[in-house]
Structure formats: C-alpha cells, structure tokens
Amino acid sequence: MKPSIVAKLEALHERHEEVQALLGDAQTIADQERFRALSREYAQLSDVSRCFTDWQQVQEDIETAQMMLDDPEMREMAQDELREAKEKSEQLEQQLHVLLLPKDPDDERNAFLEVRAGTGGDEAALFAGDLFRMYSRYAEARRWRVEIMSASEGEHGGYKEIIAKISGDGVYGRLKFESGGHRVQRVPATESQGRIHTSACTVAVMPELPDAELPDINPADLRIDTFRSSGAGGQHVNTTDSAIRITHLPTGIVVECQDERSQHKNKAKALSVLGARIHAAEMAKRQQAEASTRRNLLGSGDRSDRNRTYNFPQGRVTDHRINLTLYRLDEVMEGKLDMLIEPIIQEHQADQLAALSEQE
C-alpha cells in the first residue's frame, strides 16, 4: 500500500481514538449537539479504523512468517502462513480503498421517493402500486419509517403518482440508484387472450435536505392553488380546500399534497418536496456537465433511463445497467432488494476506484 495512503489511514485511526475519548468527556456529554455530531463522526470512522487495525496486525504476521523462513524446521509452516497473510492483506487493502472513497454527503439522509405511472394506462398504475409496496416492504425490513406525502390513485387500483418520505439510517445512500425507468412485462388481469403487455413507471429518489441547505425559493416565483382532497373516483375526503398545489414558475416543477386535513401541514410538506426536487434538478444539471467527458456506468438516474425490467411470466428481473439477471422476481417484489442494490453499489465503487486510478 502506498505510504501516502498509510499516512492518511493513521491520521483517521488517531482521530477515531480522539473522538472516542471526547465522547466520554463530561463537557461533551453536557453539550447534546456536539455529542450527536461526534457520535456521527465516530460511527463514520469506526469501519476504517477497525479495518486498518486488522491490516496492521496482518503486516506483523507477514514479517513474523518471513523471519521463520530462515528456520529449516519451520519453513513449510511459514510458507503456508505467509501465503494466507498476503491474501488477507490484499483483501483488507481492497476494503480500505473502498472505505477511503469520497462519501456522498447526502447518503445518510432521509429521502423522498416518487413513483409515477408512465406508458401503459391502468396496468402502469397497478405496477406503480406494486413498486411502492416493494419499496415499503424493503423499508420495513430495514426499520425505516414510510410517510405518504401525496398520492393520486389509479381508477382500477395502484397509483398514477405517489410521493413518500422514508426516514431512517442511510436511506438515500441505499435507494439513490433506484431513480430511473422501471419496465414491467406481464399479462394484465383484463387481458382475455393471455397476451403479455409492457408497461413502464419512473422512480425518483431525492435526499431530504435540512432547512439551512434548501435552495432559496422566492415566494414571488410560486403559484399556490388550493383544492379539495379527493380519493379514487373523485370521492371527496373532506369538504374544505385543504389540498395544496405549488407550481415553481421558473422551472415548471409542480408539487401537490393532500394527505393532511390541515392546509398549513400540506403546504409545509409540499414546500419540502419542492425544495428537494429543485435541488435534485440542480444536481442533475451539474452531474451532466461533469459526465460530459466520461459516461457514468450507472446511468444518470434520469426518468428516461431504463434501469430494470420485471418479467412476470419468466419470474425474471434484469438490471440493464450492470447486465444482472435474477430469476427471483417473487422475492424482489416482496422487498428483498439487497440482491439488486448491493451489486449496483459495488459497481459504483469500482467506477469511483477506476476514476481515482486515472487521476493518479
């Protein structure tokens, strides 16, 4: 491993020990805000510190085994130990390189999840409902909280569009690669000839930003309309104009919220989603400029990107970005998404490592 990387790891390991000592200090405990910030930093440094300690121990094992090679009686055993230690050292070095990759500051944040029916009419709306259920099951398994912000139901079930806030540890980091196009191939319940239809939905995942980081929105740039909350088929949920529709005139972004009975609460929710959407649009524009010289393997997360195909007759799900096909569709639709999410994250890390190697 390069001396510069070892020096960086030593500094991080020392900082980990320093933060650990600070967390036991009475003054730190008395200052709750500082205590929370240091607790987060300690958690972030723990993996790299532990891995570096293991790597240092393996280097000592390699040194000991090399010294034993000079002893004829110990040579055979030393050769075995040396081979094992070198293999372990390589594995730990790979882990350390991944742990040192630049972190997305949004990864630990809560996220807004939007699922929108695309081409395919009623069948697309039904699939949007299936996708939202899939993500809800995944969130439940990870003990995340799901709060519906806005929902427009399909005439025969499912959703034309649904927006939810998902709260918990590392939500955005796990779900951010879900953004893009999701295609379904199956025989609709209304299809008498047994023909397979293709429908599509789009998914957008955006980090929830703290108030201090929300983009500045000029109230003069907003058109705010009120209307009555309605359920499927136009049934009125209540008789007051509590639902809110906010249009951001410069970008044309529209957000509706009708989940709460209070107009004030709906407006607050809609503004938080609007801020996240504007931020996401600005980020996409910046990433597009950065990627103009080099195409990201994982796609842009744009709605037009085709992420996955869910083929029900074959029980198959295919992630087109990394050419991964699994015949475990039933499990995926029940929320067992790690088998799809982990390979995407690993591909992203490999992409980052390759980019760093090019820079070096």
Swiss-Prot record:
Modified residues (N5-methylglutamine): 235
Region of interest (Disordered), ranges: 284-313
Segments passing through the bilayer: none
Domain of life, per lineage: Bacteria
UniProt-listed InterPro entries: PCRF, Pep_chain_release_fac_I, Pep_chain_release_fac_I_sf, Prokaryotic/Mito_RF, RF-1
A single MF term (Gene Ontology): translation release factor activity, codon specific
Keywords for the protein's UniProt record, in alphabetical order: Cytoplasm, Methylation, Protein biosynthesis
Role summary: Peptide chain release factor 1 directs the termination of translation in response to the peptide chain termination codons UAG and UAA.
PANTHER family from the UniProt entry: LD18447P (PTHR43804:SF7)
Family in the record: Belongs to the prokaryotic/mitochondrial release factor family.
Identification of the protein by name: Peptide chain release factor 1
Organism this protein belongs to: Escherichia coli O127:H6 (strain E2348/69 / EPEC)
Lineage of producing organism: Bacteria, Pseudomonadati, Pseudomonadota, Gammaproteobacteria, Enterobacterales
